[in-house]
């Protein structure tokens, strides 16, 4: 046996452990422990053999420490307490012929979320405790092979961290229940959870000019069923699908953001990229997972922007098989999501809110499931004046500016066009001030020198530079479709 090789392997194992290369360190430790074991078998002197056994025991303890570090690092990735090694003297005696008593599970009622006056949806009961353990649930029971004291320490530490975070955020003492993604890929669940708009987009109804009919319908579809659950039953059940149709820039996405802010429901903002995957069968699984999560976090609003890109007309020559499967799964889930139709409880409803600029490309079956189809038109004269006030409320206006006169000149402009006009006009004074100045002189300008009021000439000049983005032929096409398929 080469003693120099044993020393070299032990040295490398310790060096790799100090450098953080724990996998290589464990390999060297295992090798040197086996070499010492074989060397001890060849020794005849008891004193020498005892010394080598002591060296082997010390290296074995070092190996266990490295292994414990690796286990701790893995536990951080798995989001659960690490599995520390337990010595034999700490392990109670167990008779292999006798089953141990069952470990009592902790039954904690899930706290309320979003609305304090509504009942919290209970956790899913159809998933076993074993499946919950695979995904590292927060309500996971402690394993019998862990020390009880360590489990108590981790639970107490977790409660302290949560309490500290709630105090810092000004939140309530309750924690939001987590969706149990057993049976689904963890990455898919996390991708959809990122699409939950947990923080308000800060868009209110007052920030949207005009569109009173659309606001009224959305309040009726989302807010009123939560306020009057006893009324919205049977034939009065809430609408399970609303489609907003109109030319670009008329405020469809703004209405969806206002729903997320004002209505107090869980809001999923979904796009075509969210429900698309390169792997076969995964897109359909994403659609099914989306609606299962929506039912769990109900009441929920699922907003699908540009829905024509996901569920266009089926049966065309250029349709791909994978696209057809996704459309079929979406139609099935929407038909089975009927909110009050399923559980007769409007507070557990799931509503699909969709927006499109090409309603004529939408599949007929999807059009039927989107029960309310409303037209979001170009703003009226009153709406254009309100939009000018909203867009220019943060800047100073010259006294000669009359927004009603500017609104009359913007007939045929969309809301986005009017916003662009206001933005361009607010930059006119800055452009005049920095004209002909060097970069050093521009940087030396004070904020007060740039805060010049917006004049009537600035708005008229911006109006000449920016043309309409919607043609009369497009408007006629939308109005014709609404006459044939509208349901306001």
From Swiss-Prot:
Pfam families, sorted: AAA, AAA_lid_3, KATNA1_MIT, Vps4_C
Spans traversing the lipid bilayer: none
Residue numbers binding ATP: 246-253
Residue stretches of biased makeup (Basic and acidic residues): 116-127, 142-167
Keyword tags: Acetylation, ATP-binding, Cytoplasm, Cytoskeleton, Isomerase, Microtubule, Nucleotide-binding, Phosphoprotein
Similarity remark: Belongs to the AAA ATPase family. Katanin p60 subunit A1 subfamily. A-like 1 sub-subfamily.
UniProt subunit comment: Interacts with KATNB1 and KATNBL1.
Protein name, entry field: Katanin p60 ATPase-containing subunit A-like 1
Species this chain originates from: Mus musculus
